[in-house]
Regions:
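Alpha-helix C-terminal capping segments
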Residues: 100-108, 128-133, 155-163, 167, ...
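N-terminal secretory targeting modules
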Residues: 1-85, 99, 226, 230-241
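Substrate-gating cap/lid alpha-helix
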Residues: 23, 27-33, 163-200
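Solvent-exposed, polar/charged alpha-helical surfaces in well-ordered, non-transmembrane soluble domains
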Residues: 87, 95, 99, 103, ...
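Catalytic His-Asp segment of secreted/periplasmic serine-dependent ester chemistry enzymes
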Residues: 177-241
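Conserved SGNH/GDSL esterase-like catalytic core that processes O-acyl groups on lipids
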Residues: 79-152, 172-177
Length: 241
């Protein structure tokens, strides 16, 4: 009997030890790696701001010529979309992908910041607009850290005027996504990028927290943004024809 009791106790201790190991997985290494990547990308954002202003002016000068070229050859659409003066503003999800975004949109400007919400974004837009460097289209990755009011979002859209806006929804706050869809239903220039559905079931896209992106996730995220912009511009091209 003592042997059975001791065996039972040993089994209990072993199971408890395994449980403790599973629930106390140390993510310190992953957290530090993500933190270092975001800090490096913040520097990249600052370094590219002045360069964007120069490129935007050059693109404005060449824009009409490019549109004429597109009328003659639809295959040029990829080149045109790639060279758009895209403005991307977002939180640490976008910040983590800025290298990929600059590679895909070399004439773009991307401003990502850790823990950013949509509150206060209008001031950033106004600064760009007042300096004549608010490009088109505009990409937002905002909502992961919480929503802002309807009036806050309406103010953002008013500042953007008739520019095409691509707002990426969240993977963690479905109520934010519902409100974004409702907002888009009354604004024809607001296009929702459904990152929630596209990324669902793809754990390989995410780091330990299920929100920030792995290398593979950043590639898919960037491709998703590009495809959304490309499809809208293609629709406009077809309508124009």
């Amino acid at each position: 009997n003592i042997r059975y009791i001791l065996g039972f106790m040993f089994s209990g201790i072993l199971i408890y030890g395994i449980y403790e190991y599973v629930v106390s997985v140390d993510y310190t290494k992953d957290i530090n790696k993500l933190k270092n990547q975001l800090e490096q990308n913040e520097k990249l954002v600052k370094d590219n701001k002045d360069n964007y202003m120069v490129k935007l002016k050059e693109e404005e000068d060449n824009w009409q010529k490019k549109l004429q070229t597109l009328e003659e050859d639809e295959s040029k659409l990829d080149e045109i979309v790639t060279n758009l003066p895209v403005v991307g503003i977002g939180d640490s999800v976008l910040l983590g992908a800025v290298n990929n975004l600059y590679n895909r949109f070399p004439n773009g400007y991307f401003d990502g910041k850790v823990s950013r919400t949509a509150w206060g974004i209008n001031d950033i837009l106004l600064t760009l607009k007042n300096n004549n460097v608010l490009g088109n289209p505009i990409v937002f990755n905002l909502g992961t850290n919480g929503d802002c009011s309807l009036e806050c979002k309406e103010e953002i859209l008013r500042t953007c005027e008739d520019r095409d806006i691509f707002w990426i929804n969240t993977v963690n706050l479905t109520d934010v996504n519902v409100r974004l869809n409702n907002l888009a239903s009354s604004h024809s220039n607001l296009h929702i990028i459904d990152w929630y559905s596209i990324s669902r079931g793809h754990n390989e896209y995410f780091t330990y927290d299920g929100i920030h992106l792995t290398n593979e996730g950043r590639k898919v995220y960037t491709d998703t943004i590009y495809n959304a912009i490309y499809n809208i511009y293609k629709e406009k091209y077809i309508e124009k024809k």
